[in-house]
């Protein structure tokens, strides 16, 4: 049996085609039918135009694209023998705003997407509090706006640094809101201080938590979600930041990663025209994203969960 499902909780729209056999997915194809073509739009333009155009490829992670554009231009200068050195302040502001974008995205994804969708699958006992996600995301965005201005499509990064120079009052406001955000996470999401989370080394420490994260884990295990949808058990991180380094992980073995080994090719969907690309590393598919960063960063709790629950552990 074949079925088509529209995927609309992404930036853009995609079609997912599934072939079912005995109640299981036998084949899957995904199509992105709308051409976006930022790389085509940039052809023939001045390099600085990328700082404005590239972030608009996505309303969810514009800061990541802005940083990629700024770094690409800086790399071009370096290749031309004119390296650009960032000041420690500019580097710190770039890192802070990028992390804040990730944080607000994670809060929205958890409370506005994951928990409601899992409840639709019949997993009971999960918190249905979408306003928690909206509140936490707004706090992160307010801090981000102090340094980057408008959100989501900020253009405050330039080759060599940033356009902002935060005042003492702005820094104090940022620290206050960050403290409020951390306290919210500890109270509502984790149910325990951050120090306790970071010190955990085993699933056994996580299981008794009566918090939104604890209830989520209980629901996922009760529904046997950790036994479904196994991937290749290969993870990759290519971004070089204060919180991550380029690496790949095969099961639990950490290896070096070289961006030169990334290959792209046009994807094929037999049911619909698609403008997507398949991306491989040295010929193989790898998982990227938050789990990959935790695995490559040797986060003990996450690696323990992965080892005990398997490669599909959400």
Residue ranges and their predicted role:
Residues 1-314:
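Active-site bordering "gate/hinge" segments
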């Amino acid at each position: 049996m074949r079925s088509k499902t529209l995927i609309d909780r992404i930036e853009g729209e995609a079609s997912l085609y599934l072939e079912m056999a005995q109640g299981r997915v036998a084949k899957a194809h995904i199509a992105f039918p709308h051409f976006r073509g930022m790389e085509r739009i940039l052809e023939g333009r001045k390099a600085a135009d990328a700082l404005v155009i590239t972030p608009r490829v996505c309303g969810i992670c514009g800061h990541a694209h802005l940083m990629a554009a700024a770094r690409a231009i800086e790399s071009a200068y370096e290749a031309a023998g004119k390296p650009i050195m960032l000041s420690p302040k500019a580097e710190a502001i770039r890192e802070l705003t990028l992390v804040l974008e990730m944080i607000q995205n994670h809060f929205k994804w958890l409370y506005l997407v994951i928990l409601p969708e899992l409840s639709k699958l019949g997993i009971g006992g999960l918190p249905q509090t979408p306003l928690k996600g909206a509140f936490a995301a707004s706090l992160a965005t307010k801090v981000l706006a102090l340094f980057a201005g408008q959100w989501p499509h900020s253009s405050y990064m330039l080759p060599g640094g940033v356009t902002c120079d935060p005042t003492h009052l702005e820094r104090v406001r940022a620290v206050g809101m960050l403290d409020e955000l951390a306290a919210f996470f500890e109270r509502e999401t984790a149910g325990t201080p951050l120090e306790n989370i970071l010190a955990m080394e085993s699933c056994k420490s996580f299981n008794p938590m009566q918090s939104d994260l604890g209830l989520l884990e209980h629901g996922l295990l009760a529904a046997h979600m950790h036994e479904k949808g196994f991937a290749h058990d290969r993870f990759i991180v290519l971004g070089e930041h204060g919180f991550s380094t380029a690496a790949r992980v095969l099961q639990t073995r950490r290896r070096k990663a070289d961006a030169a080994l990334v290959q792209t090719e046009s994807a094929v969907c037999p049911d619909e025209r698609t403008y997507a690309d398949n991306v491989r590393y040295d010929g193989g598919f790898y998982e990227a994203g938050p789990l990959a960063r935790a695995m490559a960063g040797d986060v003990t709790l996450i690696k323990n969960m992965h080892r005990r629950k398997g490669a599909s552990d959400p």
